[in-house]
Amino acid sequence: MSSGQSVLKQLHPLIRPYAETVLRKGNVGVCMGNLRISDVKSGRPTLTQTKEPCGDRFKIYIPFAGDSLKWEVIFDSCQPSNPPDFIFLGENGNFDPDIEKLENLTHWDPKNPESLVLAIEDLMREYRCYQKQLIEGYSRLQFEYSSLQGMEACDDVEVHMGNRLPGTLDSPVNFLIRLPIDLSPIPQYLVKDDPGEDLAVLLAKFHNSEGSRVTPQLFLSPKVEHALGDNTALRIPRFPTGGCLMDYVPQVQDFLQKQIDHIVEGYQRRREYVAAFISRFGGSVLEYDAESFTKLSLVLEWNEFFFVLHIELPSRFPQDMPVFTFQSCYHLSKTNGEPYVSVQKSYPYSPRWTGEEMAHRAKLFILDFIPQFKKVSVSSNKL
């Protein structure tokens, strides 16, 4: 049983649908992160006897600007149709939204299982406004946020700072920016399961109000990360000393766009290459990778000598040339007792050639190399 299912079983049956919808549909904020529920309790007197679960209050964790907000949601299991109360825990204690702006709380619909999700969305809208007000006392932070307003990403920016005395900055302030970049060209084969929405978000952590130290970090959705690599493999530009987000965000966007273009071009060139070989050797194709187009195997015959040609396309194709592995159908290697093979990594090749030209040149090389391969293969141990 998952932790979410365990939590739901503890809730009053009439409250459970609200929490179930939160766990299933509660994706909020720039990163579209899932909400999490824990610490289910009951507000009923301890002597009350019930035959059903009576949990009616719980903590909810909301991803926001690289942090996690912790709020407490309080229903009344004796009157489960009433709207819940909220307690904003930790650094959120001073958050005091105007109840008149929380339409889904003031007009609570107990029959709608999405009512709690809608109420949380209202609260998050007011919380974002609250955070914008907090940074107004810090000129550098206000400048950074204001400078993003004219960019495409202005509607997808979260800023988070905790409660601080006026004019002080005791802990980092986070800017979380969803980068407005088209990720749809990334090939679908990279992640087979449903990985959710494709996105790339930039977290910029300001360690002080002057911005003298800023730490950037890039977060990618599963398919995008699988294609481009994680943070250890994908080195985004450093945040320059004295720089600002208005200049830095476009640099990261350009960097990502180049990586995506490289991935897409490589995929298209591999597909073109494999298609050219299938066109020339259609009847000889043993198998090929129809998703990522990284492998191709052919069964070939020359003067009644049969062999298998395995072709592997490297990740940096076409910059790096494919590897040809000739495998005998008759003879075993003297060293390991396996089918004799000859690996060829050097032959006429240019990354500027089309797939058709590569297949044509490869065919000429294969015909030229077969006699040599047959001679060495025959000289090995026979079956």
Curated annotation (Swiss-Prot):
It comes from the Eukaryota. Residues 274-364 are annotated as: UEV-like 2. One of its GO terms (cellular component) is BRCA1-A complex. GO terms for biological process: apoptotic process; cell division; chromatin organization; double-strand break repair; mitotic G2 DNA damage checkpoint signaling; positive regulation of DNA repair; response to ionizing radiation. InterPro entries: BRE. Residues 31-150 are annotated as: UEV-like 1. It is found in: Cytoplasm; Nucleus. Keywords: Apoptosis, Cell cycle, Cell division, Chromatin regulator, Cytoplasm, DNA damage, DNA repair, Mitosis, Nucleus, Repeat, Ubl conjugation pathway. Signal peptide: none annotated. Component of the ARISC complex, at least composed of UIMC1/RAP80, ABRAXAS1, BRCC3/BRCC36, BABAM2 and BABAM1/NBA1. Component of the BRCA1-A complex, at least composed of BRCA1, BARD1, UIMC1/RAP80, ABRAXAS1, BRCC3/BRCC36, BABAM2 and BABAM1/NBA1. In the BRCA1-A complex, interacts directly with ABRAXAS1, BRCC3/BRCC36 and BABAM1/NBA1. Binds polyubiquitin. Component of the BRISC complex, at least composed of ABRAXAS2, BRCC3/BRCC36, BABAM2 and BABAM1/NBA1. Contains 2 ubiquitin-conjugating enzyme family-like (UEV-like) regions. These regions lack the critical Cys residues required for ubiquitination but retain the ability to bind ubiquitin. Belongs to the BABAM2 family. Component of the BRCA1-A complex, a complex that specifically recognizes 'Lys-63'-linked ubiquitinated histones H2A and H2AX at DNA lesions sites, leading to target the BRCA1-BARD1 heterodimer to sites of DNA damage at double-strand breaks (DSBs). The BRCA1-A complex also possesses deubiquitinase activity that specifically removes 'Lys-63'-linked ubiquitin on histones H2A and H2AX. This is BRISC and BRCA1-A complex member 2. It comes from Branchiostoma floridae (Florida lancelet).
